[in-house]
């Protein structure tokens, strides 16, 4: 077993070797290196063929028409293009947008920008299980609502929202529905023929593909219109200009092809690994699972260890790659805004660790990780005066601390 052990698959995944192999074929002079937009010679035609094949592979995972897939540089760009693109195009219809307090920053910072431009945004608070229900969405809708954006799977706590039911609601009201699906491809079945989602963001690097590439699903029937955010040569039917990076797109296509083929058995294997890990740590006192345990992807276990500082626990677990909060915001020392939205107090939010498992995680690694977590939590609590007070029956929330 090689140390350190990677248990941070929701931050990024390693590129699957089969994906890397396909990508390498599109780089050098011997390979398929042409510009897909070069229409006048065979190098361009061959590159375009590879790109369109990849587009088909992405579409097949989510049962969409390949013409509905727009290439982007990642889910952050897809979120920006979807939300700003719709807001600017449909601004004459209304200026109200609905989203949730637990979205990824790529959605929240985009809606904040639109607020500065004069749009109004309602931020839904989820239940304490981390789920945003259709009833919550319905309560937030107004006459002038033009867009609802609700994530499929949460990046910090792994909870799954019922986008099928929310889609029925938005379609009945004639409101566009955007879903950030960066964390759900290859983990949850998605059928865009059946569900009434108008826009959906995808990322390659959360699904064993390369970083720096993603896609946006833009529904054709009923047709969704967007205002482009990136201008240039008019690539991607004018929605997203810029030379297509054949190797990146081929990588994403292959990653999504593998995801479609292997998702069912991979989910079962990962669920068994997660359960095995949890069984070995659940005896720890004052252990809290963040988010619903049922409406959740098996890859994610977000735990709060009360009376242990999350940062010090991460330092103590130096052989384990885990995170507190999401990778995009874990550099700040603020407690997780997602856990705060669930109603967790600052102490519990600060003591949370996200363990995320994936394709290359082994049973041996799980057992080692669980043992290390138990040792570290026990040791850190032995050093904690708060833990002593708690064990002595003191209600710490009622203690009045003296300032010196």
Curated annotation (Swiss-Prot):
It comes from the Bacteria. Pyridoxal 5'-phosphate binds at residues 75-76, 155, 183, 203-205, 243. The keyword Chaperone does not apply. One of its GO terms (molecular function) is metal ion binding. InterPro entries: Aminotrans_V_dom (IPR000192), Aminotrans_V_PyrdxlP_BS (IPR020578), Cys_deSase_IscS (IPR010240), Cysteine_dSase (IPR016454), PyrdxlP-dep_Trfase (IPR015424), PyrdxlP-dep_Trfase_major (IPR015421), PyrdxlP-dep_Trfase_small (IPR015422). The modification N6-(pyridoxal phosphate)lysine is found at residue 206. Keywords: 2Fe-2S, Cytoplasm, Iron, Iron-sulfur, Metal-binding, Pyridoxal phosphate, Transferase. One of its GO terms (biological process) is [2Fe-2S] cluster assembly. The keyword Amino-acid biosynthesis does not apply. It is found in: Cytoplasm. Its cofactor is pyridoxal 5'-phosphate. Its main location: cytoplasm. It catalyses: (sulfur carrier)-H + L-cysteine = (sulfur carrier)-SH + L-alanine. Pathway: Cofactor biosynthesis; iron-sulfur cluster biosynthesis. SUPFAM superfamilies: PLP-dependent transferases. It is an enzyme of class 2 (transferase). Its EC number is 2.8.1.7. [2Fe-2S] cluster binds at residue 328. Coiled coil: none annotated. The active site is at 328 (cysteine persulfide intermediate). Homodimer. Forms a heterotetramer with IscU, interacts with other sulfur acceptors. PANTHER family: CYSTEINE DESULFURASE, CYSTEINE DESULFURYLASE FAMILY MEMBER. Master enzyme that delivers sulfur to a number of partners involved in Fe-S cluster assembly, tRNA modification or cofactor biosynthesis. Catalyzes the removal of elemental sulfur atoms from cysteine to produce alanine. Functions as a sulfur delivery protein for Fe-S cluster synthesis onto IscU, an Fe-S scaffold assembly protein, as well as other S acceptor proteins. Belongs to the class-V pyridoxal-phosphate-dependent aminotransferase family. NifS/IscS subfamily. This is Cysteine desulfurase IscS. It comes from Stutzerimonas stutzeri (strain A1501). The lineage of its organism: Bacteria, Pseudomonadati, Pseudomonadota, Gammaproteobacteria, Pseudomonadales.
């Amino acid at each position: 077993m090689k140390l350190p052990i990677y248990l941070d698959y929701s931050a990024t995944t390693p590129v699957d070797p089969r994906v890397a192999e396909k990508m390498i074929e599109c780089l050098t002079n011997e390979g398929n290196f042409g510009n897909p937009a070069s229409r006048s010679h065979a190098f361009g035609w061959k590159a375009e063929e590879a790109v369109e094949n990849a587009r088909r592979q992405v579409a097949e995972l989510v049962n969409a028409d390949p013409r509905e897939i727009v290439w982007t540089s990642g889910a952050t760009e897809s979120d920006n293009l979807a939300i700003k693109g719709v807001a600017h195009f449909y601004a004459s219809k209304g200026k109200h947008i609905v989203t949730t307090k637990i979205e990824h920053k790529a959605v929240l910072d985009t809606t904040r920008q639109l607020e500065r431009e004069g749009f109004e945004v309602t931020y839904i608070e989820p239940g304490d299980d981390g789920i945003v229900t259709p009833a919550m969405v319905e309560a937030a809708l107004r006459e002038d609502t033009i867009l609802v954006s609700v994530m499929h799977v949460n990046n910090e706590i792994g909870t799954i929202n019922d986008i099928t039911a929310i889609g029925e609601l938005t379609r009945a009201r004639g409101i566009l529905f955007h879903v950030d699906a960066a964390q759900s491809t290859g983990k949850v079945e998605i059928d865009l023929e059946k569900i009434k989602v108008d826009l959906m963001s995808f990322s390659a690097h959360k699904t064993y593909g390369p970083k720096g590439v993603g896609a946006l699903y833009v529904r054709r029937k009923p047709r969704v219109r967007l205002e482009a955010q990136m201008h240039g040569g008019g690539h991607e039917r004018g929605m997203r200009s810029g030379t297509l990076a054949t190797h990146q797109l081929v990588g994403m296509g292959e990653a999504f092809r593998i995801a479609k083929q292997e998702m069912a058995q991979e989910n079962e294997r990962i669920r068994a690994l997660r359960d095995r890990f949890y069984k070995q740590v659940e005896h720890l006192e004052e252990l809290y699972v963040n988010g619903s345990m049922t409406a959740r992807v098996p890859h994610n276990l977000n735990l709060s260890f009360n009376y242990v500082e999350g940062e010090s626990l991460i330092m103590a677990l130096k052989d384990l790659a885990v995170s507190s909060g999401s990778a995009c915001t874990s550099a700040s020392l603020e407690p997780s805004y997602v856990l705060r939205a669930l109603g967790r107090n600052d102490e519990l939010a600060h003591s949370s660790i996200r363990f995320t498992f994936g394709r290359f995680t082994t049973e041996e690694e799980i057992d080692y990780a669980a043992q290390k977590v138990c040792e570290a939590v026990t040791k850190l609590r032995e050093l904690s005066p708060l833990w002593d007070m708690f064990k002595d029956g003191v209600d710490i929330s009622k203690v009045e601390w003296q300032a010196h």
